[in-house]
A protein has these predicted regions:
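Alpha/beta enzyme core
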Residues: 6-8, 18-43, 56-65, 79-200, ...
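Short, small-residue-enriched loops and turns at beta-alpha junctions
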Residues: 15, 19-20, 48-53, 104-106, ...
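Short beta-alpha connecting loops at secondary-structure transitions
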Residues: 170-172, 227-235, 250-259, 320-326, ...
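A mid-to-C-terminal "edge-of-domain" accessory segment
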Residues: 5-6, 12, 247, 253-420, ...
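Non-catalytic terminal/interface segments that mediate subunit docking, oligomerization
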Residues: 18, 23, 31-32, 368-485
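Catalytic alpha/beta core domains of metabolic enzymes, predominantly
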Residues: 176, 182-306
Length: 499
C-alpha cells in the first residue's frame, strides 16, 4: 500500500445523522451504505450501537449488506459499549471498533471529574478490551484540538502500545487554525514512539468554517485517514465534506496523495443523502451545490464559452454531472425510469418499481418533463407508504377578498376522518383542519419552502418543525402545489410523534 494513500472514513451514518431532523431508518441507512461502497469509501462508521436498539440493528444490517469497506462501530471507553459494538459487528466482513475518551483539560475536569492519569488508564483499558474482539481498533482522543500536545502524545503512544491500529485526533469544537492542527499532527509524527504502527486520522468540525482546511493540513502533515461526511452534514456547523477532500486531492496533481473515491459518484450520492435526510444542499456549496458550475457574470460566461478552463478547474462530469441527461416525460417507459433512478443511486425492482412508475406518471402529467431532482423528491415521498396517517384529499377555496377555507380527509390506520376550517391563508386553513382531526396541540416552530426545480410547474419542498408536548418533530412534504406540500409536511410530523 502506498504511503501516500489516504483512507476515507465516512461517518455520515453516525456523526452526520446527529443533525436534528436528519434521522434515517434502517432501510435508508443500508441504501446510503451501499452508495458509499460504490463511491469507494474505505471505512463506514455505521452507528453507535449501545445508544439505541435502532442504531444496533442498523449496524447489524449494514454489516450484512456491505462487502468490502470496513464497518466501524462507535463506543465510549466503557466495557458494555464495546461488548454491544462487537455483537453488532459480528456479520461484518471487515470490522473495526472505534473507542476513546476526552483528553482536553476541559473534558477531564468538567465532563469526567477526573485526572490526566486516570483518563490515560481508561484509554488503555478500553483499547485492550476492544482488542479482545477485533484486530482493528481505532482510538479517539476527543477534543484533541484543545489538548496540549505533550499530554496528547502520551495518550496516543499508550493507546498504540495497547493495540490501537488507528489514532483519531478530533478537532471536536472546530477551534484549531490549519497551521495549529498541522503542527499537532506533525508533533505526534515526530514524538510518539511506535507511531509507524498506527494510522493517524483527522476528524474536523466546521464551527469556524475551517474543517476542510484543517483536514488537508493534517493530511499534508502526515495523517493518512480523514473522517468526513457527504455534503459536510453533522452537528452544529457540520463536518469535513467528503466531496471537497476527494476533489482537492484529485485536482492538485502536485499533492502526492491519492484516494479510492470514484468521483463520478459524488453528485448522485450527494443528492441521495440530501433527499433521505431532508437536508437541502446550499446553492453555493463547493462541488455539489447547484451553482457550483454556474456562471452569471458576463466576463465569466464569455471566458467559459471560449474555453472552460478559464473559470472551471473541475470538469462537471468528473463529479457525476451529466450534461446529456435523458429527459423523462409521460411517454418514458419503465426502463428509462429505472436507468435514471440507478444513476441517482436508487435501486428499484418488480412491484416497487411498478408502483413508483405510477406515481412518476402522475407527476409527468402535471410537469411535462421530470428532472432528477423531481425523482429524488418523489422517492422521498414514496418512503411514507407505511405511515399510519395518510392524506386522502385536500380542497382549498381562496381568493381576493375571501377568507380561505380548507377541507381535509385523512386515513388513520384504515379509518377515514374529515374536517374543514378557515385560516389566515390557504396553508393555515389546511393545517387548522388537520388539527381538528388529530386533536393535538401542535405548534409550528419553523416553516421553510424550497424550490427544487425551475419553472412555473416546479416541485416545492416544505420543511417543517413542529412542537408537541415538549418534543420537537421534523417533517417534509413535496408537491407541485405548495399547500399540498405543506399538508404533507405536517402529516409527516404527525406520523413521527405517533411512531
Amino acid at each position: 500500500m502506498s504511503s501516500d494513500r489516504i483512507f476515507i472514513f465516512d461517518t455520515t451514518l453516525r456523526d452526520g445523522e446527529q443533525v436534528p431532523g436528519c434521522q434515517l431508518n434502517t432501510v435508508e441507512k443500508i441504501q446510503v451504505a451501499k452508495a458509499l461502497e460504490e463511491l469507494g469509501v474505505d471505512v463506514i462508521e455505521a452507528g453507535f450501537p449501545v445508544s439505541s436498539p435502532g442504531d444496533f440493528n442498523s449496524v447489524v444490517e449494514i454489516s450484512k449488506a456491505v462487502t468490502w469497506p470496513t464497518i466501524c462501530a462507535l463506543t465510549r471507553a466503557v466495557e458494555r459499549d464495546i461488548d454491544v459494538a462487537a455483537e453488532a459487528l459480528k456479520y461484518a466482513k471487515h470490522k473495526r471498533i472505534h473507542t476513546g475518551i476526552g483528553t482536553s483539560d476541559s473534558h477531564i475536569r468538567y465532563k469526567f471529574n477526573s485526572t490526566r492519569e486516570e483518563i490515560l488508564e481508561r484509554a488503555v483499558r478500553a483499547v485492550k478490551y476492544a482488542k479482545k474482539y477485533v484486530e482493528d481498533v481505532e482510538f479517539y482522543a476527543e477534543d484533541a484540538g484543545r489538548t496540549d500536545n505533550e499530554y496528547l502524545a502520551r495518550v496516543v503512544e499508550a493507546a498504540i502500545r495497547a493495540g490501537a491500529t488507528v489514532v483519531n485526533i478530533p478537532d471536536t469544537t472546530g477551534y484549531c487554525l490549519p497551521s495549529e492542527y498541522a503542527a499537532k499532527i506533525k508533533y505526534l509524527v515526530d514524538n510518539v514512539d511506535g507511531i509507524d504502527k498506527a494510522v493517524i486520522s483527522t476528524h474536523c468540525h466546521n464551527d469556524l468554517g475551517m474543517a476542510t482546511a484543517n483536514t488537508m493540513s493534517g493530511l499534508l502533515a502526515g495523517a493518512r485517514q480523514c473522517e468526513v461526511t457527504v455534503n459536510g452534514v453533522g452537528e452544529h456547523a457540520g463536518n469535513t465534506a467528503l466531496e471537497e477532500i476527494a476533489m482537492i486531492i484529485k485536482s492538485h496533481s502536485d499533492i502526492p496523495l491519492v484516494t479510492n473515491i470514484n468521483t463520478t459518484r459524488i453528485t448522485p450520492v450527494s443528492r441521495m443523502v440530501s433527499n433521505l435526510m431532508n437536508m437541502p444542499v446550499q446553492a453555493n456549496k463547493a462541488i455539489v451545490g447547484r451553482n457550483a458550475f454556474a456562471h452569471s457574470s458576463g466576463i465569466h460566461q464569455d471566458g467559459v464559452l471560449k474555453n472552460v478552463s478559464t473559470y472551471e478547474i473541475i470538469d462537471p462530469k468528473e463529479v457525476g454531472i451529466d450534461d446529456n441527461d435523458i429527459v423523462l416525460t409521460a411517454r418514458s417507459g419503465h426502463a428509462a425510469l429505472k436507468y435514471r433512478l440507478e444513476v441517482l443511486g436508487i435501486k428499484m425492482e418488480g412491484h416497487k418499481l411498478d408502483a413508483f412508475y405510477d406515481e412518476f406518471l402522475k407527476l409527468a402529467d402535471k410537469k411535462k418533463q421530470v428532472s432528477d431532482d423531481d425523482l429524488l423528491v418523489l422517492a422521498g415521498a414514496d418512503r411514507a407508504e407505511d405511515h399510519h396517517v395518510k392524506l386522502e384529499y385536500l380542497q382549498v377555496t381562496s381568493g381576493k377578498g375571501l377568507r380561505p377555507i380548507a377541507s381535509v380527509g385523512l386515513d388513520i390506520a384504515g379509518e377515514k376522518f374529515e374536517a374543514a376550517s378557515r385560516g389566515n391563508g390557504p396553508v393555515d386553513a389546511a393545517i387548522n383542519a388537520l388539527k381538528i382531526i388529530i386533536r393535538r396541540q401542535m405548534v409550528i416552530k419553523e416553516f421553510t419552502i424550497q424550490n427544487i426545480t425551475k419553472g412555473s410547474d416546479d416541485v416545492g419542498k416544505v420543511h417543517m418543525q413542529v412542537e408537541h408536548d415538549g418534543h420537537v418533530y421534523y417533517g417534509f412534504g413535496a408537491d407541485t402545489d405548495i399547500v399540498t406540500a405543506s399538508v404533507e409536511a405536517f402529516i409527516d410530523c404527525i406520523n413521527k410523534f405517533r411512531g
